[in-house]
Structure formats: structure tokens, C-alpha cells
Amino acid sequence: MEVIIGRDTAELAHVGADAFESLLNRKPDAVLGLATGSSPLSIYDELAARCQAGRVSFAKARGFTLDEYVGLPADHPENYRNVINTVFASRVDFAPGAVAGPDGLATDIPAACAAYEEAIRAAGGIDLQILGIGTDGHIGFNEPGSSLASRTRIKTLTRQTRVDNARFFGDDVDAVPAHCLTQGLGTIMAARHVVLVATGRSKAEAVHQLVEGAVSAMWPASILQHHPHATVLLDDAAAHRLQLADYYRETYRSKPDWQGI
């Protein structure tokens, strides 16, 4: 696991966008795993600017979203297909229909989850998955207690996650759906490269457990300690509980250019 502690959000956005740009320049038809939430927004902004400048193209790429609320109407602004289209996909040159998501309106939920797993496999697997992290250590909607080997499935959201997400629903916790479909931890671990971004002091405990804690289902993100190519992007506030923060900073400062991200 590589831990990068940036000076500010702008630096983290550049580093995260570099990972996408490098991949797409090597493999224009790459398969991308796309997360919603506030954490990746600065990276999406940077990628949109680079696409408009002609530095990177998504024309041959495909995308798979990480999760979706169950029962949220297709035209609801917080339906994650709409969210990812608004914050990212519509701002770059993805081909029509190139970004897919779990079907939160399916009548047969297990079949929809199996179909989503098969779609990812048929596309060749995810080359780069971007992630945020919840204050309780969840990634995707894999809440504490999730199986570390889980695949795409339905989950019940914790009260804390619904409280955290209420800001997207007019601060009304009861308006946040109680259930979701999410890629499982096993699905996420199958991605070839995982980039997780976390900013702010509220994420510091989750980041500490992710990077330096024991691998445990109680902190789902900690499974990334076992990933062969995981990159964690942090600002100072999110990193302030890390015991080896100075070492991570020094390692990144002295990293040779040829190593890439």
C-alpha cells in the first residue's frame, strides 16, 4: 500500500488524475470503477479539465459505478447513475452507454447483482477503481461487519451512513434509502489498481484503521492492506492519526519518477 499525504486537495487531485491519465494513455479501452460521494470530486474536476485540454480521452473506456440505492427512482437526482453522469461522465468524452451501474430498481435483486458481476467480468475486470471511505471505514456500501470476500449484493445501511449522506437529501435522514446494492469487498479487491482518497479530520480514525490497524470486517477498508496495488491519497487532516505519517511523506518525496503511481 502506498500512502501519499498531499499538501492540499489540489495536489491530491493531480496525483489521482495522473493515475487515470497514465492508464488511459497505455490502455485507451481501460475499465474504470467510479465512486460517488464528495471524496473523488476534485479528481473528477481535474480529469474533466485534462479531457477538455486533449490530454486524456475516455472515448474507448468503460465505467462501472460502485453502488446504487435500492428503490430510488431513475430520475431522482441522487440516483447514482445520475450523480456520476452529472459530476463526471457528461463532462468527458465517454461513449453513450459506456458507464453502467447496479440496477437498484430490479424486481429480482440477487439476479441483478449476479448480472452486474458478470458484466464486470465480461468487460475484462476493472483496471482502476477509485474509492472514498466512510467515517466508519466502509468502502462502497460495505458497512462494518461485511464479509471480506463479498461480491455485489444488497446491504442495509447503518444509521451513521444515512446520517452522513443526509446532506444529499436536504438533511433529512429519513429520506436516505435504507438499502443499497454495492460491489462487494471481494469485487473491489479484484480491481488491478485501487485509488482511495480521504480528506478532513472526520476521516482520520477510519484512515488510521485502514492503513495501520488490523485487517478486520469491523473496518472494511482495512482489507486493502492485502491489495497488491493500492494507493491512498490523504490530506494532513485525514492523516493526522497515522503513526508513520512522517515516513509516508519522506517515502513519497524521495520516490523515483520511473516508479509512477
What are these regions (language model features)?
Residues 26-52:
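Glycine-rich N-terminal segment of FAD-binding domains in flavoprotein oxidoreductases
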Residues 186, 190-261:
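ATP/nucleoside-binding phosphotransfer catalytic cores, i.e., glycine-rich phosphate-binding loops
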Residues 33-37, 65, 102-103, 130-133, ...:
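Short beta-strand segments
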Residues 56-129, 246, 251-260:
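Ligand-binding beta-strand-loop-alpha-helix segment within the catalytic cores
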Residues 136, 140-185:
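Class I SAM-dependent methyltransferase SAM-binding "motif I" and its flanking Rossmann-like core
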Residues 1-32:
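N-terminal glycine-/serine-/threonine-rich phosphate-binding loop
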Residues 46-57, 80-82, 144-154:
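A glycine- and small-aliphatic-rich helix-loop capping segment at beta-alpha/alpha-beta transitions
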Residues 111-113, 140-146, 150-152, 206-210, ...:
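A short secondary-structure junction signal
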